[in-house]
């Protein structure tokens, strides 16, 4: 039915996360494992890893790519102009509470080191944590903030982001929807209307 309202669907994608499974049995256990993780160089420059914020019973999970300098220094997931915009998007368009209705985390849990590129080594260290969080939370919808977060979640590095942005993608046991990152919208305010439409589609799925 949703197709008749302009919704775009993409065929299901299966990501094999079996080799990545951890022994942790709760979101809190995963958070403790992240806090004690020193598998890559990013752990050396971080103030503290950001393990995830929000409700462990949330049906909506938001995944950013990496921890920003502002987030790392403040410990606040919604710090800075980008964070403030994301909070407004969640509260004013999705009509969700950032503490009780969502779980916000990052694909890469620590602030990148200066001049770091690619993040493949760091992603290989972090991806087990992210997929374990998804496995434990069992969200209905996962929102990827930007191209990089989408690529980490889907394993698709080549897809033109404009082609999949806003599409409803069946990914294993949940629905994945990629939207523009708030930092992109701050630089390209003309795209806010597009992001608003994407968020309205997500709200209709809840």
State the predicted function of each range.
Residues 1-206:
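A polyanion-binding, active-site-adjacent surface
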């Amino acid at each position: 039915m949703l197709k008749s309202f302009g919704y775009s669907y993409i065929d299901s994608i299966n990501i094999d996360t079996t080799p990545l499974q951890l022994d942790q049995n709760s979101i809190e256990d995963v958070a403790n494992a992240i806090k004690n993780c020193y598998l890559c160089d990013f752990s050396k420059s971080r103030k503290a890893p950001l393990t995830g914020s929000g409700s462990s019973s949330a049906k909506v999970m938001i995944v950013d790519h990496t921890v920003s300098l502002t987030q790392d220094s403040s410990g606040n997931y919604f710090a800075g102009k980008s964070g403030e915009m994301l909070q407004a998007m969640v509260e004013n368009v999705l009509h969700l509470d950032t503490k009780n209705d969502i779980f916000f985390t990052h694909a890469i849990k620590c602030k990148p080191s200066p001049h770091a590129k690619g993040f493949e080594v760091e992603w290989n260290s972090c991806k087990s944590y992210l997929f374990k969080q998804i496995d434990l939370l069992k969200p209905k919808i996962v929102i990827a903030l930007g191209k990089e977060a989408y690529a980490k979640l889907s394993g698709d590095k080549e897809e033109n982001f404009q082609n999949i942005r806003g599409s409803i993608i069946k990914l294993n046991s949940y629905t994945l929807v990629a939207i523009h990152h708030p930092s992109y919208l701050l630089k390209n305010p003309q795209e806010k209307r597009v992001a608003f439409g994407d968020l309205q589609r997500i709200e209709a799925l809840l």
